[in-house]
Amino acid sequence: MEEQVFASKKVGVLPARWGSVRFTGKPLANILGKSLIQRTYENISQSTTLDKVVVATDNQRIMDHVLDFGGDCVMTSPECANGTERTAEAISRYFPEAEIIVNIQGDEPCLQHTVVDTLVRKLEESPEIQVVTPAAKTTDSHEILTNQKVKCVFDKNGKALYFSRSPIPHILKKETPIYLHIGVYAFRRNALFSYIESTPTSLSQAEDLEQLRILEHGGSIHICVVEAKSPSVDYPEDINKVEKYLTCHSSASF
């Protein structure tokens, strides 16, 4: 059977796998009556800049669920090492005309579509930028100190200098701002496949942060500072935090 292909130019991809080490079956976890992946999908589908939003999975249960709630879903290989590889495979197989690709982690059920729109517009307005990702300021000591939250530093023009699970920069003055990285990336097509073709690097492996691979190979990532900062789901116990957040923000478009 011939695979369906789409003519979309600007595509949001939600990579979703079943076999997460930290939380098996996470995409289908129930959050106040809807699955994690459905909440993420419905939020991003409100985007005013994307032509198509699609879930990319390696699991039939996830695909069936997405199709049941009316979403678009494509099947990818179980051999993909990370979400970016899964995104690239989905684009290569199903979206031959895609020019701007947004890789949106499927564990961000509270992510507002306006964050995605900010990234897409940045690429549209700035032809010299190849990859763009958001960050939000934080003063929360737990977020700063935990290695589960990624921090970033960037120059005065927004060019990323480094990403780390450690607190960066080192704080000698209380007024020094700390920025949390939000795990969403907007790529130009060539930049996405350049990443896929590049070799793993020492810092990306040491920090377990795939974006460092781009920097270590001499590429650049632009940072867009956004106001929106919301909880993600990494472990089963994070579900309760997300439900509390959604309850407190019930007037928002969730």
From Swiss-Prot:
The pathway this protein participates in, as annotated, is:
Nucleotide-sugar biosynthesis; CMP-3-deoxy-D-manno-octulosonate biosynthesis; CMP-3-deoxy-D-manno-octulosonate from 3-deoxy-D-manno-octulosonate and CTP: step 1/1; Bacterial outer membrane biogenesis; lipopolysaccharide biosynthesis
Similarity comment: family membership: Belongs to the KdsB family.
Q: GO CC terms for this protein?
A: cytosol
Q: What this chain does, per the record? A: Activates KDO (a required 8-carbon sugar) for incorporation into bacterial lipopolysaccharide in Gram-negative bacteria.
Specify the protein name.
3-deoxy-manno-octulosonate cytidylyltransferase
Per the record, the major location class is: cytoplasm
- Which HAMAP family does the record associate with it? KdsB
Kindly list the organism's lineage: Bacteria, Pseudomonadati, Chlamydiota, Chlamydiia, Chlamydiales
Under catalytic activity, the entry for this protein gives: 3-deoxy-alpha-D-manno-oct-2-ulosonate + CTP = CMP-3-deoxy-beta-D-manno-octulosonate + diphosphate
Q: Which InterPro entries match?
A: Cytidylyl_trans, KdsB, Nucleotide-diphossugar_trans
